[in-house]
């Protein structure tokens, strides 16, 4: 991976609820120019949003905040092993746990219908008073 163009981002995942020294393990093989998309594991039921936040904080301390992003799983496992869309209140609990962090949603278009996006967006505006800066229209685009 060292020969790949920079920057490069790698998606990482752990099947353990709170893996020990996960941050150090990731650092041991991750090229210096790479960042990580840490998949939270909440959608598959491996961990809670709070557990995912602790792992994210460890990754940020070890790799740097500029090289670490959390990927919010917008789905849940059903009893038959298939997946369903996460309910808006489930997504909101994840967003609350990751407050102040850069969040990407997987798989937004597949698991987040229009009504779910509207509900989460309305909640965000009511709680934070605005749309996230990363979603706002750039100032120079007018």
What are these regions (language model features)?
Residues 1-142:
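Glycan-processing catalytic domains of CAZymes
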